């Protein structure tokens, strides 16, 4: 699936929490040929970053933790250099992330990350999911919610952090392809991604366009 037999294919899945990006990454690992290394936000934030610096690259929009915010560009740079190194060794990489630039000031992280993978085959996928479905998924995982609940829950206001994610994560909206997890299963999303890879990454690719985006 790579344009160069000596480099691994890279797939970046960009979306908000509960958008279904992690499930797509797992489907790719299970279904695609060869090893696909998952270097996404959950691995980096939960298992690599020290607890006192979490949520690391998962820092949500809103500029709420300036002590962590100042480290986020460094964390992302190191992660993307690791992705580049895996690809250089011929390993395929899938990374589910939540890129945004809603910090105390614009940091230009996505453009910087794109430059770090400039010479590699990268498919940048926007993972979309309507906010009402995101809320359903959040409610379904609440530990105190009755599994046998029969009455429809009363409408709840969408929390501000959820709205911020929905507004910020798909800016500037430059992708090679998009999937909507409200209409496609993770397996179907993975198959759509496979089809795009077999067809070829558009030229110029999303990451090539993002290198010059401000």
PLM-predicted stretches and their roles:
Residues 13:
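Hydrophobic anchor at the beta1->P-loop junction of P-loop NTPases
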Residues 19:
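ATP-binding Walker
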Residues 22:
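Walker A/P-loop
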């Amino acid at each position: 699936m790579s344009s160069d037999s000596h480099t691994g294919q890279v797939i970046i899945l960009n979306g908000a929490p509960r958008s279904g990006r992690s499930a797509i990454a797992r489907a790719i690992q299970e279904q695609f040929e060869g090893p696909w290394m998952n270097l996404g936000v959950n691995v980096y934030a939960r298992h690599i970053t020290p607890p006192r610096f979490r949520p690391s690259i998962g820092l949500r929009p809103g500029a709420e933790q300036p002590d962590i915010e100042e480290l986020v560009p460094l964390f992302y740079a190191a992660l993307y250099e690791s992705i580049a190194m895996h690809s250089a060794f011929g390993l395929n990489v899938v990374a589910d992330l939540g890129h945004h630039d809603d910090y105390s000031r614009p940091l230009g992280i996505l453009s910087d990350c794109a430059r770090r993978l400039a010479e590699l085959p990268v498919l940048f996928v926007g993972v979309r999911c309507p906010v009402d479905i995101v809320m359903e998924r959040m409610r379904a995982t609440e530990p105190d919610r009755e599994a046998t609940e029969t009455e429809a829950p009363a409408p709840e206001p969408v929390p501000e952090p959820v709205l911020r994610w929905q507004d910020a994560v798909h800016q500037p909206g430059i992708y090679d392809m998009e999937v909507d997890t409200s209409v496609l299963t993770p397996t179907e999303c993975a198959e759509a991604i496979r089809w795009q890879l077999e067809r070829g990454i558009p030229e110029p690719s999303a990451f090539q366009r993002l290198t010059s985006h401000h």
